[in-house]
């Protein structure tokens, strides 16, 4: 789907995208760390995480408790016993350019207050494999684990023992003690060499068995076998590069520590790590490893820089989920050439049209690619890609790979520019519309105007309706939903609940392949379980534009009532009243001008209502000056923006008069004034309920439901009105449960500690947030103390 620049996101759009990114990245973490079957490349994953961080940086108050920026890896799989790491296995922040690598060196210097003194780093190739931790006691391997979520991993000791590179007993020490710490966790990477990977896949293909997409998947799948004998048959290797818990220090520098690891019997990275100095050294070693990369026997995806001095590492400490003293410099995304065979259009839930390139299959970075996003019509025109072109494909930046551009010298004769359709690809062929922003500029997105009449939008609405954060109906997956939609059994959300009581259809379903008594009974049970549901999930499930999960909760709490379907009827009535009082187009255009805030907007509207004479100040030199005479309190940036927008006095005066006539009514203003709603969400809600077909489908749905009101936050508790931060590991409740509990008690839950924070609840592993709270003199309590205070 097309992507709005972070700088252009509204708060509502940012909140909705952060919600989507949290879900998407959690799913990718699960596929990568547990299922060993990632569906996107590392470059794509890094791009998603970077966009998440960029949005959080711009909207820090929207940082979610389940933010990917707070998480490492994924929870352990249930088939393996849990292992708690003595020291968490953290991930590294990334750098993607020379400038970012240089800035890393500058940050280190600023923190350590160094000016001209040299800073030394170890630079190691970043192996693309599966992280593992090995615990040795008195030199003997006693336990091995995967990273898991960084805190809890999976016990794969027996499997790791089968890898020849892993010593069962450390070398070079006295068995009675000495030579190595009594207790130490060695960290490293399990990987497979490219030649061994290719040989395994070739043999598996010939035998009709499963093949793997890339060496990393193969290594992970081979290590995480229930039967260690299978792991023993796989060509697994291990590089050691770090350590976690240790009972005593054993080195003064990272460089010295790597030497000790080799002395104890481990293989460290090849090409070997190098010790470099200052920013230029970081850039030089990166260039060297990039040249050597194609010659290596295994995959590397970058270079890891670590401050060499361990005392400096200790002083630098950690930020969030990563060490301040290390960073991973990633190689650029890999590219390939292929043929653009066709351009298809996909229709989203809100009617947005996304062009998708259909490509001649090509392997990029070990993954076969057949599709790539083209974002929108403007992007196709800008890149001038045409059907039949040879194009350069890059796996980075989007969930589906992207086309960098065409190879013009290979363009076939007769290739013509792509003409973006004017009508939806559905059988109704409804016209596509291109909307305008509040400031009057056209958006890049084209939308199908058919709304619920469009079958593509209807199925996307249904998918959203049954999604995990909406109705989350167990037993009704996308495949079943699509089949029921095609047959006409489910055309709108209400049909789902009608199906559960349609004995004729259920009887027919029991006779079908893949169903039977048990699966149909489970489907009915899943549907019936959602007849009673909270108002917030109902609002979110409707799939209104600009109304994400957070906004749905705000609305549900504001309109909560024991009557009228949990408050839904009150919400609908308020939206319908507001629908007749929406601001006019010229009002929105005027209000969207740069420098025009709410006060300036109101002053302009009042001036327009009073009527402006035709150029009452002809002696003025410019329109900006005339506007200043007409509305004296306007700022200079606002005057300049309005003068550029309207050009002359008559056009400006006419716009002001129209804006005055199009000013919104009181009911709309009340809806928009709800804390957390605002004008964009208010307009979306009002426009949704203004449509007769929406009201009809909503009426059908709520007739099937018992909607429960969402409890309004209390105002008479010990924490009402206070800002609270939860940090560290919570042992008696999840972060979501803690947040819900605090908000229900009238508190505001924040993700970072500041002077405005009233209370920090700190669990095991609390780091920088606890330190900041202590420095600021903010009250800190344990999870048990919190529960005792709130009566949990």
Curated annotation (Swiss-Prot):
Cofactor annotation: Mg(2+); Mn(2+)
GO cellular component: cytosol
Listed GO MF terms: DNA binding; DNA ligase (NAD+) activity; metal ion binding
Protein residues bound to NAD(+): 42-46, 91-92, 124, 147, 189, 306, 330
List of catalytic residues: 126 (n6-amp-lysine intermediate)
Keyword list, A-Z: DNA damage, DNA repair, DNA replication, Ligase, Magnesium, Manganese, Metal-binding, NAD, Zinc
Residues annotated as domain BRCT: 714-792
UniProt: Zn(2+) binding residues: 424, 426, 448, 454
SMART domains listed in its UniProt record: BRCT (SM00292), HhH1 (SM00278), LIGANc (SM00532)
Function: DNA ligase that catalyzes the formation of phosphodiester linkages between 5'-phosphoryl and 3'-hydroxyl groups in double-stranded DNA using NAD as a coenzyme and as the energy source for the reaction. It is essential for DNA replication and repair of damaged DNA.
PANTHER family per UniProt: CHROMOSOME TRANSMISSION FIDELITY FACTOR 18, DNA LIGASE
HAMAP family named among the record's database cross-references: DNA_ligase_A
Record's protein name: DNA ligase
Source organism of the structure: Caulobacter sp. (strain K31)
Gene behind this protein: ligA
């Amino acid at each position: 789907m097309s992507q709005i620049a972070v700088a252009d996101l509204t708060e509502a759009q940012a909140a909705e995208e952060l919600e989507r990114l949290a879900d998407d990245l959690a799913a990718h973490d699960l596929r990568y760390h547990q299922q060993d079957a990632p569906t996107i490349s590392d470059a794509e994953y890094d791009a998603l995480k970077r966009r998440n961080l960029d949005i959080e940086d711009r909207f820090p108050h929207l940082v979610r408790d389940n933010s990917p920026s707070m998480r490492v890896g994924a929870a352990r799989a249930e088939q393996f016993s849990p292992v708690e790491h003595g020291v968490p296995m953290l991930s590294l922040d990334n750098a993607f350019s020379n400038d970012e690598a240089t800035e890393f060196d500058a940050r280190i210097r600023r923190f350590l207050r160094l000016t001209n003194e040299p800073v030394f780093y170890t630079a190691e190739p970043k192996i693309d494999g599966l992280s593992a931790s090995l615990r040795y006691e008195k030199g003997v391997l006693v336990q091995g684990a995967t990273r898991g979520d960084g805190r809890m991993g999976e016990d794969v000791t027996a499997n790791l023992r089968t890898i020849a590179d892993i010593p069962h007993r450390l070398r070079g020490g006295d068995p009675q003690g000495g030579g190595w710490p009594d207790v130490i966790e060695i960290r490293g990477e399990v990987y497979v060499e490219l030649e061994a990977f290719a040989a395994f896949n070739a043999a598996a293909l010939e035998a009709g068995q499963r093949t793997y997409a890339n060496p990393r998947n193969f290594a992970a799948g081979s290590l995480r076998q229930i039967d260690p004998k299978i792991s023993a048959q796989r060509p697994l290797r291990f590089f050691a590069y770090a350590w976690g818990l240790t009972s005593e220090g054993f080195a003064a520098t990272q460089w010295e520590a790597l030497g000790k690891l080799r002395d104890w019997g481990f293989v460290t990275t090849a090409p070997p790590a190098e010790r470099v100095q200052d920013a230029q050294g970081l850039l030089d070693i990166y260039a060297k490893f990039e040249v050597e990369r194609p010659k290596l026997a295994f995959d590397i995806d970058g270079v890891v820089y670590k401050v060499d001095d361990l005392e400096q590492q200790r002083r630098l400490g950690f930020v969030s989920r990563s060490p301040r003293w290390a960073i991973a410099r990633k190689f650029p995304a890999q590219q390939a050439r292929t043929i653009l065979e066709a351009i298809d259009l996909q229709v989203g839930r809100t009617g947005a049209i996304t062009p998708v390139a259909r490509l001649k299959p090509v392997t990029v970075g070990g993954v076969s690619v057949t599709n790539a996003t083209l974002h929108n019509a403007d992007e196709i025109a800008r890149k001038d890609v045409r059907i039949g072109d040879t194009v350069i494909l890059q796996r980075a930046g989007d969930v589906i790979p992207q086309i960098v551009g065409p190879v013009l010298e290979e363009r076939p004769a007769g290739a013509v520019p792509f003409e973006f359709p004017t009508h939806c690809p559905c059988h109704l062929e409804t016209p596509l519309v291109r909307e305008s922003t509040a400031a009057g500029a056209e958006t890049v997105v084209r939308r199908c105007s058919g709304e619920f009449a469009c079958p593509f939008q209807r199925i996307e609405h249904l998918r959203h309706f049954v999604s995990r954060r909406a109705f989350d109906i167990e037993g009704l997956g996308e495949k079943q939903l699509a089949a029921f939609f095609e047959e006409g059994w489910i055309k709108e959300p209400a049909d789902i609940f009608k199906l559960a009581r349609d004995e004729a259809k259920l009887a027919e379903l029991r006779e079908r392949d893949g169903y039977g008594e048990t699966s149909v009974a489970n489907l009915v049970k899943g549907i019936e379980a959602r007849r009673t549901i909270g108002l917030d999930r109902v609002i979110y499930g409707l799939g209104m534009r600009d109304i994400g999960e957070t906004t749905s909760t705000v609305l549900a709490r504001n309109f909560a009532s024991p009557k009228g379907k949990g408050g839904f009827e009150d919400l609908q009535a308020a939206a319908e009243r507001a629908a007749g009082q929406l601001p006019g187009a010229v009002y929105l255009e005027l209000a969207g001008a740069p420098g025009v805030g709410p006060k300036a907007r109101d002053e302009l509207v009042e001036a327009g209502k009073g009527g402006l004479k035709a150029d009452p100040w002809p002696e003025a030199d410019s329109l900006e000056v005339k506007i200043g005479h007409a509305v004296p309190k306007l700022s200079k940036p606002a005057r300049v923006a309005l003068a550029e927008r309207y050009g002359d006095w008559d056009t400006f005066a006419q716009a002001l008069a129209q804006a005055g006539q199009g000013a919104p009514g009181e009911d709309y203003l009340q809806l928009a004034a709800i804390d957390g709603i605002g004008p964009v969400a208010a307009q979306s809600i009002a426009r949704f309920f203004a449509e007769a077909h929406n009201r009809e489908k909503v009426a059908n749905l709520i007739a099937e439901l018992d909607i429960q009101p969402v409890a309004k936050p209390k105002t008479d508790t010990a924490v009402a009105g206070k800002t609270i931060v939860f940090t560290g590991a919570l042992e008696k409740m999840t972060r979501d449960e803690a947040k819900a509990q605090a908000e229900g008690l009238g508190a505001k839950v924040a993700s970072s500690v500041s002077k405005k924070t009233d209370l920090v609840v700190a669990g095991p592993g609390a780091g920088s947030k606890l330190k900041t709270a202590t420095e600021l003199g903010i009250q800190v309590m344990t999870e048990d103390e919190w529960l005792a205070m709130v009566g949990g």
